[in-house]
């Protein structure tokens, strides 16, 4: 809906309240981030926990559940990856990737302590304010669950603000089930 206050790609670097992200002078500028942790989710799927190198960027970066960043590997290229963190837990950003393409394979070779670049956030966040005091059903499949993980985290941390929550996630095999440690 055009009247929604959730920001979108036309205003990168904004948070879900329509307030400009104050972390960067230019939201298109690549910000260096250190890999703090690398978590194996399933075969060829990993979550990278990142921390911005610059403290001002770390303090000022805001995003809405459902937005994504452009993740840049120096000398290789960049790829759009969903932010799978709760925006209410600042300081660290989680991004889950399937290691299949040239850029994601380069990301997959990185280790904790290595640095990559981030631009964003981009996209329209999920309309979670509209779901307050209502039941929520989330339906996903495969790695398609990544864009809603931030929303799930957000809802779980504010459980008293939402009705019943049902998550239906389809996968080929039990080994393909992602985020077990996070949601079990």
Regions found by a protein language model. Give the residues of each.
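Charged, low-complexity, helix/coiled-coil-prone segments
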Residues: 11, 50-59, 90-97, 126-128, ...
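FNR/FR-type flavoprotein reductase catalytic core
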Residues: 3, 9, 102-184
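Accessible peptide chain termini
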Residues: 1-3, 16
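Ferredoxin-reductase
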Residues: 19-114, 171-173
């Amino acid at each position: 809906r055009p009247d929604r206050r959730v920001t979108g790609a036309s205003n990168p670097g904004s948070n879900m309240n329509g307030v400009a992200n104050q972390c960067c002078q230019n939201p298109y500028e690549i910000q260096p981030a250190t890999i703090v942790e690398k978590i194996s989710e399933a075969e060829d799927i990993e979550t990278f926990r990142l921390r911005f190198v610059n403290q001002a960027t770390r303090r000022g970066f805001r995003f809405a559940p459902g937005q994504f960043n452009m993740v840049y590997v120096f000398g290789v290229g960049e790829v759009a990856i969903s932010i799978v963190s709760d925006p209410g837990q600042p300081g660290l950003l989680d991004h889950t990737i399937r290691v299949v393409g040239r850029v994601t394979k380069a990301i997959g070779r990185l280790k904790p302590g290595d640095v990559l670049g981030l631009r964003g956030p981009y996209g329209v966040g999920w309309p979670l304010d509209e779901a307050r005091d209502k039941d929520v059903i989330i339906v996903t499949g495969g790695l398609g669950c990544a864009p809603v993980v931030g929303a799930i985290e957000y809802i779980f941390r504010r459980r008293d603000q939402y009705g019943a929550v049902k998550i239906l996630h389809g996968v080929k095999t039990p080994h393909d089930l992602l985020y077990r440690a996070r949601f079990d």
